[in-house]
Amino acid sequence: MKTFMAKPQDIKNRKWYVLDAEGKVLGRLAAEAARILRGKHKPDFTPHVDTGDHVIVINAEKVVLTGKKLRDKKYIRHSGYPGGLKVMNYEKLMKTRPELAVEKAIVGMLPHNRLGSRMAKKLKVYRGPEHPHQAQKPEPWQAL
C-alpha cells in the first residue's frame, strides 16, 4: 500500500470557514486557524502541498489574551533605519489594529517559507462581525 501524496493540481474545491474570535483566547484561535489554513483537518493532507481552506476571522477586537499579556506582551517592528525600532504593547495594538494582532499570531504558526506565504493569503481578518465574503458561502467552524 502506498502513501497518498496530493499534487497541487488535485486540490480543487477549497471551502471557506468563518471563525468567530469573540471571547476566544488568541493563541488557541490562531492554532485552530493555522490548522485549517494548512489543511491538517483533511484526510488528504500533504506537508509539501497547500491543501488548506480559506479562513475568515470575525470579531478580532473581542479576542482575549490571558494573564498580564495585554500589558506585558510587545509588538515590535523595525523600519530598517538606525533608531527605527517601534515598540507597542498589545493593549494599545488591540485598541488601534486588533486585526493585525490576530493576523500576526496566525501567520506566525504557519511555515516560514513560500508555502506559508501562499497559505497566509487565504486568511482574512476583520475587526467586527461583518465581512464582504458572503458570495463564497462560508461555513461556521465549530471545532473551537
From Swiss-Prot:
One Pfam family from the record: Ribosomal_L13
Matches recorded under SUPFAM superfamilies: Ribosomal protein L13
UniProt GO molecular function: mRNA binding; structural constituent of ribosome
Single GO biological process annotation from the record: negative regulation of translation
GO cellular component: cytosolic large ribosomal subunit
Role: This protein is one of the early assembly proteins of the 50S ribosomal subunit, although it is not seen to bind rRNA by itself. It is important during the early stages of 50S assembly.
Similarity-based family: Belongs to the universal ribosomal protein uL13 family.
Protein name: Large ribosomal subunit protein uL13
Species of the source: Pelotomaculum thermopropionicum (strain DSM 13744 / JCM 10971 / SI)
Gene that this sequence comes from: rplM
